[in-house]
Amino acid sequence: KRYEANGKLILTLKDGDYCSQDIKTFSKVTDITIIKRGPGGVADELVIATDKGTYKIISEYNIRAVLCDGVTRVVRQDGSEVSMPNLLPSAFFVIEPSHDKKNVVGYNIIGGGFGHGVGMSQNGAKNMALQGLGAEQILNFFYEGCEICSEQ
């Protein structure tokens, strides 16, 4: 479905190179790996290996769309759940395989909230403040190299 919307950024591994071509129907995902992140830490390139082929998904928007199956529920920090029918809330996440005794049976996507992955994370700033860091320390963390001064 996403290939039809943006085929130049949904690529198939063929003879050692990625190219734009229709995606074959597959029944099993064998691996998911984030291979590139943007400056803010958002997933920017993702490789999905399946029983029928390997695919590279480029851009945080495409990644959020491809990984959102429309039925999986998102568990928020407060424990509440919400349905995400079309798009994951953010590309700021890690992926961890879920195992039974021996086999991978699924993947957990552990995210960093709603956002675009640039600037200051509200959750991050809040947690830093709860750990005792001051406003200047928090701002310097998120905006490295900036100088904080009084306006005159």
Q: Predicted segment positions?
A:
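Conserved, single-site charged/polar hotspot
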Residues: 1-152
